[in-house]
Amino acid sequence: MKYIPPLNFSPVVSTDVSLYRSGYPMPLNYSFIKHQLHLKTIIYIGDKDRPLEEYQSFLESEKIKYYHIFMDSSRDEGIQERMNQVLHLVLDVRNYPILVHSNKGKHRVGVVVGIIRKLLQGWSTAGICQEYGLFSGGMKDGVDLEFITMFETNLKIPRNVIPGFAKHCLYLNELEAAEGSDDESGSESILTAKQPI
């Protein structure tokens, strides 16, 4: 059988867990998703109100959890909170394997992946910009890249659900936080945007 991945499909993380990015899956991609990815969760970052009917049927038949995080652009009001929602999903190992997709797999997913690269993988700004440009066909949206660079968060994440790939950056944050605190609760990690970029 021939498998066809969705537009702009690529792995983001493939270590202890699998996180993928893409454009909107079409029916010709469903076999690939079913037989190659074995997804538990799909996060749609976009402006469509609801999934297409056949897509909804596919999600239900495969028992894939579907989350819609509305995003028109990185200029949206409330975008900070929406990115935090995405991070909460990505930082819970029980949701994996995960596919994060937008309509074309370029700008909106590029913002999400850029934030993941920055906060959870310690990538440099140059690396994030280069990857963003590759998937957007060389069209680098200065507003998106500025949003990624300036993005800050302060999420509390239960330690027992954090995927292995994110633990190193979270550990570095804990060391920084511990220098100025006597709190030794130990049950949560705090995700901050303090990695050098």
UniProtKB/Swiss-Prot annotation:
One of its GO terms (cellular component) is cytoplasm. InterPro entries: Prot-tyrosine_phosphatase-like, Siw14-like, TYR_PHOSPHATASE_DUAL_dom. Its main location: cytoplasm. It holds the Pfam family Y_phosphatase2. Keywords: Cytoplasm, Hydrolase, Phosphoprotein. Residues 10-160 form the Tyrosine-protein phosphatase domain. It is found in: Cytoplasm. The modification Phosphoserine is found at S181. CDD domains: PFA-DSP_Oca2 (cd17661). One of its GO terms (molecular function) is inositol diphosphate tetrakisphosphate diphosphatase activity. Gene3D superfamilies: Protein tyrosine phosphatase superfamily. Belongs to the protein-tyrosine phosphatase family. PANTHER family: TYROSINE-PROTEIN PHOSPHATASE, TYROSINE-PROTEIN PHOSPHATASE-LIKE PROTEIN OCA2. Present with 4530 molecules/cell in log phase SD medium. Required for normal growth in the presence of linoleic acid hydroperoxide (LoaOOH). This is Tyrosine-protein phosphatase-like protein OCA2. It comes from Saccharomyces cerevisiae (strain ATCC 204508 / S288c) (Baker's yeast). The lineage of its organism: Eukaryota, Fungi, Dikarya, Ascomycota, Saccharomycotina.
